[in-house]
């Protein structure tokens, strides 16, 4: 079996390097190191890879909620193409209940380039690129628990409250 490398796609930015064996279920990234891309999503080949981490969109990961994935020990990374697709608190809790591993979120472009990413402090999604357009009411500028001072989108519950407060 040959893996095709596409120079136009970025490698996955794993939240807490180094990346363990990771199954990427979206075609936005190129394989690198222990990161393998399964563009057709979760299937027998992805299961045989026995990933310690899984990367996918919310619909893909929601489809895996009833699955038992014994090798999954490190993380679930939810990728979205816009901030509007980030997880609600309820969806995040469903992933945690099903997989019992840390949940991370990333906003990425179709070429896999990182636009925003959640850190290990899980206190919002750090803005990584000026290409990402975000409602200023949803941005937190105070230092994060991870030590970074970059602006970030507030956590899901706080994003909802900020918009609701503005609407009053």
Which residues are covered by each model-predicted region?
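Active-site glycine/GP-rich loop and adjacent strand/helix microenvironment
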Residues: 1-168
């Amino acid at each position: 079996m040959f893996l095709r490398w596409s120079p136009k796609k970025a490698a996955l930015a794993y939240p807490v390097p180094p990346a363990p064996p990771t199954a990427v279920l979206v075609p936005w990234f190129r394989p690198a190191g222990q990161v393998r891309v399964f563009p057709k999503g979760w299937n027998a080949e992805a299961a045989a890879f026995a990933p310690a981490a899984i990367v996918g969109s919310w619909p893909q990961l929601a489809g895996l909620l009833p699955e038992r994935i014994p090798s999954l020990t490190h993380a679930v990374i939810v990728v979205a193409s816009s901030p509007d697709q980030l997880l609600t608190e309820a969806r995040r809790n469903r992933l945690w209940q099903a997989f019992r591993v840390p949940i991370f979120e990333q906003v990425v472009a179709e070429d896999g380039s990182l636009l925003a990413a959640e850190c290990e402090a899980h206190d919002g999604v750090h803005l990584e690129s000026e290409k990402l357009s975000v409602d200023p009411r949803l941005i937190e500028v105070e230092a994060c628990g991870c030590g970074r001072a970059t602006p970030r989108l507030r956590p899901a519950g706080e994003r909802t409250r900020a918009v609701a407060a503005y609407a009053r």
